[in-house]
């Protein structure tokens, strides 16, 4: 199984795994890992391995927990991102709900992508759509800003559906949402 994992372009780690499994994957896996903390309760399991992750997608509360600071402003988001990157983490995409995404990487590149205009029918599934778009765009080799932009669009499109998974999810429909601005 490790050969299969190591052959991946990217491993998406959903934080419902036991802590020992997360540590094993981070210690033994060679493929880059994008982790989604899932919740503040489960986010703590990622603290010991932050420096081994290629990317992290916390929401505001998860980023506050992992950076040990409150995020009330854009400057706070930037400072929290720096604290997380100081652990050795490669890239962080802090999802700030209606305020969009603040992204930063170890090279010093940053991006603030405002939320795409949408009519929210159901926010459940929005974060998962953001994580999926981040993974897909990272694998494509998009820039930090473009990756965050597509993720914002995917989250907005997901939230427009009354169901958890929007059956209209596609790159074309995400682009339509992004062009509404």
Predicted stretch roles:
Residues 42-43, 47-48, 74-181:
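Conserved phosphate-binding/catalytic region of the ribokinase-like
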Residues 1-10, 27, 172-181:
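Conserved N-terminal subdomain of the carbohydrate kinase-like
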Residues 8-79, 99-101:
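Conserved beta-alpha-beta core of the PfkB/ribokinase-like small-molecule kinase fold
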Residues 2-5, 58-61, 133-134, 142:
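A short alpha-helix capping/helix-coil boundary motif
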Residues 1-3, 18, 45, 122:
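Poly-acidic low-complexity segments
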Residues 5-9, 33, 67, 117, ...:
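A near-ubiquitous, low-amplitude feature marking generic local secondary-structure context
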């Amino acid at each position: 199984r490790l050969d299969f994992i190591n052959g991946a372009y990217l491993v998406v780690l959903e934080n419902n795994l036991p802590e020992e499994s997360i540590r094993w994957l981070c210690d033994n896996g060679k493929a880059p890992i994008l982790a989604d903390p899932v919740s503040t309760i489960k986010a703590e399991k990622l603290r010991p391995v932050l420096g081994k992750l290629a990317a992290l997608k916390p929401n505001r509360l998860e980023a506050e927990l992992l950076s040990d600071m409150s995020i009330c402003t854009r400057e706070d988001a930037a400072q929290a991102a720096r604290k997380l990157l100081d652990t050795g983490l490669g890239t962080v995409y802090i999802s700030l709900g209606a305020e969009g995404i603040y992204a930063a990487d170890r090279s010093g590149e940053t991006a603030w992508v405002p939320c795409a205009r949408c009519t929210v029918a159901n926010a459940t599934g929005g974060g998962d759509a953001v994580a999926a778009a981040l993974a897909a765009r990272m694998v494509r080799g998009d820039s930090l800003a473009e990756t965050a932009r597509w993720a914002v669009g995917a989250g907005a499109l997901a939230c427009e559906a009354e169901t958890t998974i929007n059956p209209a999810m596609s790159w074309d429909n995400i682009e339509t949402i992004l062009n509404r601005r």
